[in-house]
Amino acid sequence: MAKKSGEGQKIISDNRQARFNYHIIETYEAGVALQGTEVKSIREGKVNLRDGYALIRNNEAWLLNVHISPYQKAGDFFNHEPRRSRRLLLHKQEIRKLIGKVEQQGLTLVPLRMYFKRGWVKVDIALAQGKKLYDKRETIKRRDDKRAMQRAIKQY
């Protein structure tokens, strides 16, 4: 189920894999244009951000490949398509800034987390650069070293 964090924020889904696979450069908060059954399914926490990414087409930001499970209590006729493209609600100046940065080689937009903020569904989008294999190994090594140090401190 979703967990609470901070004032008026309820985290629905967290994309931990994105933090491992990418160097996060900047983050942006964006609203998402959703259908009714999508919101109901999100309230149940049935969202997967792992394979998701964002694109900018015709000066509009789009969230692609994010899986929101169909709402169980709605019939098939009224339900939404699980992996449809969803429009991100950003200010024009933010979109212009992102267009310039995404055109640089190797930068992409990935969703980091989805949450409710005062009843509205929000997504944290990160401008990110892909990590190389040796960067990932270094991250794992640092995490293991930190864990070993914490264990040693706890014993004393």
Curated annotation (Swiss-Prot):
It holds the Pfam family SmpB. Keywords: Cytoplasm, RNA-binding. One of its GO terms (cellular component) is cytosol. Its main location: cytoplasm. GO terms for biological process: trans-translation. Disulfide bonds: none annotated. It is found in: Cytoplasm. GO terms for molecular function: RNA binding. Belongs to the SmpB family. HAMAP family: SmpB. Required for rescue of stalled ribosomes mediated by trans-translation. Binds to transfer-messenger RNA (tmRNA), required for stable association of tmRNA with ribosomes. tmRNA and SmpB together mimic tRNA shape, replacing the anticodon stem-loop with SmpB. tmRNA is encoded by the ssrA gene; the 2 termini fold to resemble tRNA(Ala) and it encodes a 'tag peptide', a short internal open reading frame. During trans-translation Ala-aminoacylated tmRNA acts like a tRNA, entering the A-site of stalled ribosomes, displacing the stalled mRNA. This is SsrA-binding protein.
